[in-house]
Amino acid sequence: MRKYDPIIVALDFPEERKALEVAEKIIPYVKNFKVGLELFSVAGPHIVKALKEMGTNVFIDLKLFDIPNTVVRTLDRLLTLDPFMVTLHILGGEEMLRESVKLVSQYKESNKTEYPYLLGVTVLTSFNEETLRRSWGISRSLPEQVLFLAQLAQETGLDGVIASPWEIELLRNNLRRPMLIVTPGIRLTKDKTDDQQRIMTPREALERGSDYLVIGRPITQSSDPYEVIRNIRSQIEDIVESRL
């Protein structure tokens, strides 16, 4: 069992060297790191191994989305890296989800571990109501679509979902049983959105029921990332302590 810490730092960099430099600076203060598609595409499994050797927990965020056989084979390779979390798109469908859950469950049982958490992506935080309709042709409202996908994730056995801060309360109030909610779109102030549409501060997200916060640019692009982390921890300390 790893000590609970809701902060996950997103290493969204186009090169391995820069990602490791940033990680080395803040490892004394945070242990959870996210490797996304951009970094994995240039550094591959090596970046995960390098971070693991530094004593970190690695969230592999590739949002797998393909035919079931391809996703399962890819997931099987990712499991050799001992990840903390792995993501796939819930839109991949019930068969893809169930086969992925089956594989990960077998891995957990064989290795006597509760990790990785298998997480389903609901609706990307860059989407809003208009882009949901225009890009996907879906008539449901954005909250309805998030809930629909989260319910499918729960029915097929996933450990949790990726959902924006705006949908946390909706999920907590409507899912049949608790599941992990991992929240991107975290900003220290609401006046800096970048390419994110549905954002919230760290404390607000935890108060609404998020379990983990994915925070990238506010930390990694700061001239003093330690100070940013310290400020975040001071804001959420009481909430974290209540969950230990």
Curated annotation (Swiss-Prot):
It holds the Pfam family OMPdecase. GO terms for cellular component: cytosol. Gene3D superfamilies: Aldolase class I. One of its GO terms (molecular function) is orotidine-5'-phosphate decarboxylase activity. It catalyses: orotidine 5'-phosphate + H(+) = UMP + CO2. Belongs to the OMP decarboxylase family. Type 1 subfamily. Homodimer. This is Orotidine 5'-phosphate decarboxylase. The lineage of its organism: Bacteria, Pseudomonadati, Dictyoglomota, Dictyoglomia, Dictyoglomales.
